[in-house]
Structure formats: structure tokens, C-alpha cells
Amino acid sequence: MSLAGLVLVVEDEDPVRRYTVSLLEELGFTVLQAIDGIEAIEVLRHRSGEISLMLLDHSMPGLSGEEVLAELEREGLTVPVVLTSGYDRTSLERRFAGHEIADYLQKPFRLETLDETVRAVLANRAQAS
């Protein structure tokens, strides 16, 4: 099964965002970028139906990852979310227990880990459809 799609990368740190985008493009994905939570919400308001997956940074200035999720829920915008963070998965699962998170990805991550995570989330989404 071929799993490709449009991925939104939400990351305020430019080097991390560029690295993530380059890895996803290397894996064959088309990528949109947002430098903060406000831009991410704007992109999703206009293109949520096209976006297959969002990689969302947990900690950003302005709107945090948690605030972005809360706003998307208020607006009824749904997209599978992989939360990215330097924090460990267990603490993130506790903190984000009230939100729908498809998976967690601890930074720094390697190409193989990103590939496995993204493809697993997209495969689960395809099976649910």
C-alpha cells in the first residue's frame, strides 16, 4: 500500500523545521510549513480537508501545541496529529490526555523513526476510512 499525502509541519525553530521538511520530502511527502500555532490554525482553516497529517511542536511561543489543539477542537477541524517534543512520551501522554493525539515523536528523531511513525498513523487513518 502506498501512503503519501500532504503533511503540515508546525515548528518554530527554523533548523528543526527545515530538517523535518527535508526528511518528509525525501520520504515522498508533500509538505506545508507553519512557523507557529497561529499560522498552523490559518493553514488548517483553509486546507484541513487536504492535509493527511500534522506534525505539531509541543512548545512554541504564542500558541503552544496544546493551545493549537484546543482551538482546532473548538473549530471542529480534525487532522491526525503527531506531537513532537524533546520531552519523553510518558509525560506528554499525561499532559495531553484530554486531546486526540495519533502518536508522539521525541526530538531529535531520525529518518527511520519519522518514516515509521508517519506511515503508521497514515495506515491507521486509511483503515479507519
Tell where the protein language model's regions lie, with residue ranges.
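Charged docking surfaces used in two-component/phosphorelay signaling
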Residues: 18-26
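Receiver (REC) domain active-site loop signature in two-component systems and cognate sites
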Residues: 60
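Active-site residues of response regulator receiver
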Residues: 57
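Acidic, metal-coordinating helix/loop segments flanking the phosphotransfer/catalytic sites
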Residues: 33-53, 93
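Acidic catalytic/metal-coordinating carboxylates
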Residues: 36-39, 64-68
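Alpha4 helix (beta4-alpha4-beta5 surface) of REC/receiver domains from two-component response regulators
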Residues: 67, 74, 78-79, 87-106, ...
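Conserved acidic carboxylate
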Residues: 11
